[in-house]
Curated annotation (Swiss-Prot):
Gene3D superfamilies: 1.10.10.200, 3.30.70.980. It holds the Pfam family Transcrip_reg. It comes from Rhodococcus opacus (strain B4). Belongs to the TACO1 family. It comes from the Bacteria. NCBIfam families: PRK00110.1, PRK12378.1, YebC/PmpR family DNA-binding transcriptional regulator. Keywords: Cytoplasm, DNA-binding, Transcription, Transcription regulation. GO terms for molecular function: DNA binding. GO terms for cellular component: cytosol. It is found in: Cytoplasm. This is Probable transcriptional regulatory protein ROP_68700. One of its GO terms (biological process) is regulation of DNA-templated transcription.
Length: 250
C-alpha cells in the first residue's frame, strides 16, 4: 500500500469522526454555495454542485441546509457570502510539505489563522510555488467496499479514464485526471455501484517518510489548521509505513 493510500485511510477515518462536528457540516455547505455560484444552481447541469450535494448527503447534512446553500449560491435566496479560494503553502515538522486550501470571505483573517496554526505547531509558511509543485491535482472517488471486489470496480471505471483503483481496507479509492471525474462516477452509477464522494484532490508526487512521533506532530499541525473555519482542505506529502501505522493504532 502506498503512502498516499495510508494517508487516505487515516484521513477517511478522521473524516468519519469530523463528520459529527458542526464545523465539518459548515465546510460542506460552503462547497455547495460556491459550486452553485460558479456553475449555476441546477445539479443536473453542474457536476461540481452535484458532487458537493452528494457528499453532503452522505455525511448526513440535513436536506434543508443543503437546499438553502444551493439557493444562496444560485442567487435564489439572499445571504450568500463572497467566498474566495486561496492556497497557502508551507512546511511542517520533519520537512513535510503542506498545502492549505482556504475558502474565505476574509483574506486577512484566513492568512492570520493559517500562519498562527503553522508557527505554533512546528511549521513555517513558504513562498507561492515553492511547495505546490510537489502536488498534482487529481480526481478522486471513494466508495464503501460492500459486496464489490477491486476487479468489479476496475472493470466499471477503466474505460471512463480511471488511472488506478486502490484497496484502502474498508473502502476503495479511484484516482483519475480531474477532467475524467464525472465520467468515472457516472460509470459507477451506470454499473449500479454506490459511491461516497467524488471530488478534485491534491496528490503528492514526492513523499517524506516519518516515524510515529513525526506523524503525530504532522497530525497535530493538520488538526490545528482544520480548526479554522476558513480552511477547507489540508494536503501533505507525509509517507506512513505499515510499522508507523501500527504504532499509531496502539
Amino acid at each position: 500500500m502506498s503512502g498516499h493510500s495510508k494517508w487516505a485511510t487515516t484521513k477517511h477515518k478522521k473524516a468519519v469522526i469530523d463528520a459529527k462536528r458542526g464545523k465539518a457540516f459548515a465546510k460542506l455547505i460552503k462547497n455547495i454555495e460556491v459550486a452553485a455560484r460558479t456553475g449555476g444552481g441546477d445539479p443536473a447541469g453542474n457536476p461540481t454542485l452535484y458532487d458537493a450535494i452528494q457528499k453532503a448527503k452522505k455525511t448526513s447534512v440535513p436536506n434543508d441546509n443543503i437546499e438553502r446553500a444551493r439557493k444562496r449560491g444560485a442567487g435564489e435566496e439572499a445571504g450568500g457570502a463572497d467566498w474566495q479560494t486561496i492556497m497557502y503553502e508551507g512546511y511542517g515538522p520533519n520537512g513535510v510539505a503542506v498545502l492549505i486550501e482556504c475558502l474565505t470571505d476574509n483574506r486577512n483573517r484566513a492568512a492570520g489563522e493559517v500562519r498562527t496554526a503553522m508557527t505554533r505547531n512546528g511549521g513555517n509558511m513558504a513562498d507561492p510555488g515553492s511547495v505546490s509543485y510537489l502536488f498534482t491535482r487529481k480526481g478522486v472517488v471513494t466508495l464503501e467496499k460492500g459486496d464489490q471486489t477491486e476487479d468489479d470496480v476496475l472493470m466499471a471505471v477503466l474505460d471512463a479514464g480511471a488511472e488506478e483503483v486502490t484497496d484502502l481496507g474498508e473502502t476503495f479509492e479511484i484516482v483519475s485526471e480531474p477532467t475524467d471525474l464525472v465520467a468515472v462516477r457516472s460509470a459507477l452509477q451506470e454499473a449500479g455501484i454506490d459511491y461516497d464522494s467524488a471530488e478534485a484532490d491534491f496528490r503528492a508526487s514526492v513523499e517524506v517518510p516519518v516515524d510515529a512521533d513525526g506523524a503525530r506532530k504532522v497530525f497535530k499541525l493538520v488538526d490545528a489548521l482544520e480548526e479554522s473555519d476558513d480552511v477547507q482542505n489540508v494536503y501533505t506529502n507525509v509517507d506512513l509505513s505499515d510499522e508507523v501505522l501500527a504504532e499509531l493504532d496502539d
